[in-house]
Amino acid sequence: EVPVIIRNMDQDTAVRAMVDSNLQRPNILPSEKAFAYRMKMEAMNHQGTSGGISAKDIGKNANDSARQVYRYIRLTYLMNDLLNAVDRDVIGLQVGVELSYLTVPEQEMVEEVHESTGKYPSLEQAKKIRQHREEKTLILL
């Protein structure tokens, strides 16, 4: 037998409770943390409580700064292949964040280059790719 506490709560409160519980796990993948933070932020926005609770408050329980919470949330915009590379620590978190600003076709281009060369961009290269994208000078081959 396992002791159980049953609580009556709405969907958004249940999401927040589930996310808080999952973030306490000792070994959590970057993608899991990313989606947990995003779900919690969305639940709080839906409840209209985001004004009182910030990204800083969300990250506090997991010892992450507000800036780090936003970085993790950015990872949720990566296509699966790139996100899996972050989870496997083949791509660093910050490189993943930079690549998350690219469109899906642009991210696919990065993955195609990886498949042909076996390499992902460095942080400096990822920043340059993002800069070209924002300046609309990135050309897809």
Regions found by a protein language model. Give the residues of each.
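Amphipathic alpha-helical extensions and coiled-coil-like segments
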Residues: 38-41, 66-141
